[in-house]
Structure formats: structure tokens, C-alpha cells
């Protein structure tokens, strides 16, 4: 998988892609990966795809709540953000000095060593 836990990503597709500022300019939403669901190929991104969960009261004296929380989005809808250029970019893998490294395809800079 091209995304790792803690990576800063941009939303590149879907209803959560843009937010408009006060001037009407569209800004791509970004967030940090909180959790990865490998089998479903989904990720949980901080502050993205907020849904409301209705919680029923557990006891008679308790009240029910409406809780805001993040919902998972598909892995294909996110792209890693290049830290130097601050743009979403694809990620590749290559072998350098007998180590597998992850790198940005646009700039060619290495993200991390995997071994």
C-alpha cells in the first residue's frame, strides 16, 4: 500500500475534496492518516468525511448523544503530499544501496527507508 500511518495526505476525489474559503476559492482538503483498513482498502483521515452517529442511552438516567466522527474513505481517493513542494503526488518504490525506499514520483525525493 502506498500510504502509511501518520502520512499527510490530500483528498483528490469525492465529496470531501474541496473546501471553499471566503473569497470563493477552492482549497484541497488535507489530513493525517489515523488508521488503515487493509482488507477494505480504506483509510481514516483526520478531519475528513465527518459523519454523525446517534448514540442511544445505556441506562434510564443517561441521555442519548449525537457524536461527530470520521468515516473511512477509499485509498484511491487520497494522495501523499510532497513535503518540499506541498502538492499531492504519487508514490513509488525503488532499491537504493540494497534497501527498498519510498519516494515521490514528481520530485524524486526519498520519503523513507523501508528496511
Curated annotation (Swiss-Prot):
GO terms for molecular function: rRNA binding; structural constituent of ribosome. SUPFAM superfamilies: Translation proteins SH3-like domain. It comes from the Bacteria. Pfam families: ribosomal_L24. CDD domains: KOW_RPL26 (cd06089). Disulfide bonds: none annotated. InterPro entries: Rib_uL2_dom2, Ribosomal_uL24, Ribosomal_uL24_KOW, Translation_prot_SH3-like_sf. Keywords: Ribonucleoprotein, Ribosomal protein, RNA-binding, rRNA-binding. One of its GO terms (biological process) is translation. GO terms for cellular component: ribonucleoprotein complex; ribosome. Part of the 50S ribosomal subunit. Belongs to the universal ribosomal protein uL24 family. One of two assembly initiator proteins, it binds directly to the 5'-end of the 23S rRNA, where it nucleates assembly of the 50S subunit. This is Large ribosomal subunit protein uL24. It comes from Phytoplasma mali (strain AT).
